[in-house]
Regions:
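Short, charged/polar micro-motifs that form catalytic or ligand-binding hotspots
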Residues: 10, 45, 57, 61
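Structural detector for internal amphipathic alpha-helices that build alpha-solenoid repeat scaffolds
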Residues: 15-31, 52-64, 85-99
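Short inter-helical turns and helix N-cap capping residues of alpha-solenoid HEAT/ARM repeat scaffolds
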Residues: 12-13, 47-48, 79-84
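Surface-exposed beta-loop interaction hotspot
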Residues: 2-17, 21
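Amphipathic alpha-helical scaffolding segments comprising HEAT/armadillo-like alpha-solenoid repeats
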Residues: 1-8, 30-45, 65-76, 99-102
Length: 102
């Protein structure tokens, strides 16, 4: 798992970061893990739309309730309407599975 985090930390372009974030999402533990959360959450706030979009997908693999604030921000104010829609769908999914912030 350390390799996945190192890949995110070492990414030098938005494309390489997006790929690393997706892999980190795939490899994230099902139980909340601060190290994975911090990196994916940062990607949800990235200036590049491609990174944010990939981070939204990464969240689907380990839907920690702690992602709700970032997803809500994307849903309410992201410049990309498609990304706003994806965040809305994911938040609805969180509601269905009972993933609420503690």
């Amino acid at each position: 798992m350390a390799e996945l985090l190192a890949e995110v930390d070492g990414a030098s372009t938005p494309v390489s970061l997006a790929r690393a974030v997706l892999r980190a999402g795939l490899g994230a533990p099902h139980e909340f893990d601060e190290t994975f959360f911090a990196r994916i959450n940062a990607a949800l706030h990235h200036s590049d739309r491609r990174v944010r979009e990939t981070a939204v997908w990464a969240v689907t693999f380990s839907p920690y309730a702690e992602y709700r604030p970032a997803l809500t921000t994307i849903r309410e104010s992201d410049e990309d309407p498609g990304l706003r829609d994806h965040a809305e769908i994911l938040l609805e999914g969180f509601d269905e599975i009972g993933s609420h912030e503690q």
